[in-house]
């Protein structure tokens, strides 16, 4: 799961709603979980750069 999310993040730090729904379905997670993961990941990215 994390690997898939990291790959997606590498290509695109911001998700469209449609992409978020696709990822949520593919990984059996809720849209909210995906949204929060990306928010957290962006904060981590910002901190590291």
Swiss-Prot record:
The keyword Transcription applies. It comes from the Eukaryota. It is found in: Nucleus. The keyword Magnesium does not apply. Residues 1-49 bind DNA. One of its GO terms (molecular function) is DNA-binding transcription factor activity, RNA polymerase II-specific. Pfam families: Homeodomain (PF00046). PROSITE patterns: HOMEOBOX_1, HOMEOBOX_2. InterPro entries: Antp_homeobox (IPR050296), HD (IPR001356), HD_metazoa (IPR020479), Homeobox_CS (IPR017970), Homeodomain-like_sf (IPR009057). Keywords: Developmental protein, DNA-binding, Homeobox, Nucleus, Transcription, Transcription regulation. One of its GO terms (biological process) is anterior/posterior pattern specification. Its main location: nucleus. SMART domains: HOX. One of its GO terms (cellular component) is nucleus. Forms a DNA-binding heterodimer with transcription factor PBX1. Sequence-specific transcription factor which is part of a developmental regulatory system that provides cells with specific positional identities on the anterior-posterior axis. Also binds to its own promoter. Binds specifically to the motif 5'-CYYNATTA[TG]Y-3'. PANTHER family: HOMEOBOX PROTEIN ABDOMINAL-A, HOMEOBOX PROTEIN HOX. Belongs to the Antp homeobox family. This is Homeobox protein Hox-A5.
């Amino acid at each position: 799961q994390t690997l898939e999310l990291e790959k997606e993040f590498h290509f695109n730090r911001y998700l469209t709603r449609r992409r978020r729904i696709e990822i949520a379905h593919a990984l059996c997670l809720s849209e909210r979980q995906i949204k929060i993961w990306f928010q957290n990941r962006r904060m981590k990215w910002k901190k590291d750069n």
